[in-house]
């Protein structure tokens, strides 16, 4: 929200976001980016309020400390109306960022390097409206794949934008879930059971999250629940957030066999639908 406000009105005020309970979600990437573009940032710790103002935004080279999806998006939406050229290094390049850049270009922005981690933005004075079809939600698609497997159901997920799913189909396949691409749809047949693969050397499969094109962290919770009903074992390694796996105690109370190794890792021993 703040990025577009800053670009259009020269100021943006927002209360401190509440966020969720998956771990620390620092906002430094956003505000450091705004400051480099010429904005002044003030945080009122008493009121827990963020204020960002700028008389004039100027293009600059920005090296992001982390490939933050929302941080990159906020900086892009600010830089498109800054004077001069902005280069964003270590930019997030998820499909959602790619479609944001494509939509902004349709509105009159000048962004090149789309789909890479180095974006070049030539500032423009104004943007126009456009028609844009948003991507399907890859988290919902992964959730439906898991839902089909865990309930032994047959489903077809329509219009998934398959080329933008990255590793999602292959990771679910490693859990033993059968699926078939049919054009831009995914067909999942009913399965009585599914068996987790191991690595080539026979060691336990590890599934971990990573920035795009790695496996999205938002689906690790789904993978963990699906694995609890499989045959075999898997190590889930949540690298990005330190509190995301703390829900496993609820699954253990329900009968799941899960060992929480540390805040970032859990070993799931599948019980083949026996709980």
Protein language model annotation of sequence segments:
Residues 1-275:
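Short, structured segments at the rim of ligand-binding sites
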């Amino acid at each position: 929200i703040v990025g577009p406000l800053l670009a259009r009105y020269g100021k943006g005020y927002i209360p401190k976001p509440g966020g969720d309970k998956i771990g620390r979600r620092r906002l430094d990437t956003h505000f450091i980016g705004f400051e480099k573009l010429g904005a002044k940032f003030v945080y009122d710790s008493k009121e827990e309020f963020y204020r960002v103002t700028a008389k004039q935004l100027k293009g600059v080279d920005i090296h992001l400390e982390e490939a933050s999806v929302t941080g990159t998006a906020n900086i892009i939406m600010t830089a498109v109306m800054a004077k001069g050229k902005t280069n964003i290094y270590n930019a997030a390049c998820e499909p959602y960022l790619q479609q944001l850049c494509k939509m902004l270009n349709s509105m009159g922005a000048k962004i090149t390097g789309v789909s890479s981690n180095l974006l070049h933005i030539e500032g423009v004075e104004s943007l126009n409206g456009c028609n844009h079809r948003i991507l399907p939600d890859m988290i919902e698609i992964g959730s439906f794949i898991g839902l089909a497997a865990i309930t032994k159901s047959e489903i077809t997920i329509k219009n998934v934008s398959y080329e933008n799913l990255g590793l999602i189909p292959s990771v679910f396949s490693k859990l033993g879930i059968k699926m078939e691409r049919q054009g831009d749809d995914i067909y999942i047949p009913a399965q009585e059971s599914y068996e987790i693969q191991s690595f080539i050397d026979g060691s336990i499969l590890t599934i971990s999250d990573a920035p795009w094109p790695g496996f999205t962290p938002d689906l690790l919770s789904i993978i963990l629940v699906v694995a609890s009903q499989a045959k075999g074992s898997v190590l889930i390694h949540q690298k990005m957030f330190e509190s995301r796996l703390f829900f496993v105690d609820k699954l253990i109370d329900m009968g799941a066999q899960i060992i929480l190794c540390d805040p970032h890792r859990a070993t799931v021993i599948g019980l083949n639908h026996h709980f």
